[in-house]
Amino acid sequence: MLCGVTVLFLRLFPIVAALMGCLGLIGCAHTPVSLTVFEALGIGKNVDAIKLNPKLRYLRVSTPDRVALMVLGYSVDSLEGAVETWYSSGGEVLKLQNGRVVSSAGLYTDWRSVKYSGLPTWRQVIDKKIAEYSRTRDQMPAYKFGIQEQLVLGAVATPDNTRLLGVSASALHWFEETVKGSQHGWPSARYAIGFKDFAPTVVYGEQCFANDRCISWQTWPASF
């Protein structure tokens, strides 16, 4: 299995490298300020105009002042849901499971080994509108290990301050996740759920890694 994953990544990496430089979403490990290849060439920040390879899957990732694309390297099935590993050519990695961040690397603030306990399915969340569960994670830098948090996930009205593109926000079910006992519920998250083949699917997500370090993502191009 590992050999197959390695071969796939080596095959994808030149394509990713040609697509963009350091992701620069909330920082890059080797430069304080990073631009994509397209910005460096003067084409600007509009990655939405890039011609996509139909054989690859893309993730549109953004912050308030920067947008970039990541490419799916591989997906590993598990009982809790497939873990998708997304890459940028600058070395940033984002792992998602059921639309939630379970690991990151190469950002200013990284989460590692994210584990949930008592996590409901998205269908259960949609039916009940609210849920509580726990999360354990490690955080870098500062070597914070085994951070334990109690989370509350609840339905919210359709927001008007998202970075969602190509999909009507009002057509989705919106939920906000907050940390109990923390100031303003940080680090918070937000999810938009739609139905694909009658199954609830995360169409759009936001995650704050710290009070001022937030990213959003959606599969690209928008197809819901």
Residue ranges of model-derived segments:
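C-terminal motif of bacterial Sec signal peptides marking the signal peptidase cleavage site
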Residues: 24-27
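Homeobox/homeodomain signature
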Residues: 15-18, 49
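Surface-exposed, glycine/proline- and aromatic-rich loop segments on solvent-exposed faces
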Residues: 111-118
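Bacterial N-terminal signal peptides that target proteins for export
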Residues: 2-16
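Acidic, serine/threonine-rich low-complexity disordered tracts
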Residues: 29-103, 113, 129-224
